[in-house]
């Protein structure tokens, strides 16, 4: 690797594990993702943090949750779902193709909806929606009482925020972690 390259990643593994897992989408021209792919057991990486604040607030575990993610933005929700299996939650995961879905079998079809925007729209054991998460939200209004957590690219976050607000979800019930 050589030089210091900074990137922000969200922890994928739950706190109960004795190892740290992150999801990294390999970008063809990407410096860091390409180098991470070449890492071998025993290679040294410098990690700083955590710096985010995504968590289930005390006293809210009995409420209904809506997790909305695109791509590797599913990371915090995977961690939250494994750490809090009792949550009444639904996860919308927006991807271009089924190969980009991560561990969907952990959630069950009643709690997981894959929103696939590309032309390949088949995946076994998954509830599929043909289109983006934003289109799904427009067609399936969200109850204003849901706690909504969003993670992914900024365009999706801002658009989902506006849709959730139009459904009557107050800003105090919308939490976001923006990737880029």
Give the ranges of each region predicted by the language model.
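FNR/FR-type flavoprotein reductase catalytic core
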Residues: 31-180
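Ferredoxin-reductase
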Residues: 1-41
């Amino acid at each position: 690797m050589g030089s210091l390259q900074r990137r922000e990643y969200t922890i994928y593994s739950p706190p109960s594990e004795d190892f740290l897992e992150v999801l990294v989408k390999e970008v063809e021209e990407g410096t860091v993702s390409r180098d991470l792919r070449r890492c071998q057991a025993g290679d040294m990486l410098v990690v700083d943090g955590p710096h985010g604040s995504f968590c289930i607030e005390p006293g809210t575990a009995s409420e209904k949750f809506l997790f909305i993610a695109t791509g590797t933005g599913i990371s915090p929700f995977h961690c939250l779902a494994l750490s809090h299996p009792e949550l009444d939650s639904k996860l919308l995961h927006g991807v271009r193709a089924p190969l980009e879905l991560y561990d969907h079998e952990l959630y069950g079809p009643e709690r997981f909806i894959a929103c696939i925007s590309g032309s390949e729209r088949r995946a076994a054991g998954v509830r599929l929606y043909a289109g983006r998460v934003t289109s799904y939200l427009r067609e399936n209004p969200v109850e204003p009482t849901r706690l909504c957590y969003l993670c992914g690219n900024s365009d999706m976050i801002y658009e989902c925020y506006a849709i959730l607000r139009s459904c009557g979800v107050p800003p105090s019930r919308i939490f976001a972690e923006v990737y880029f």
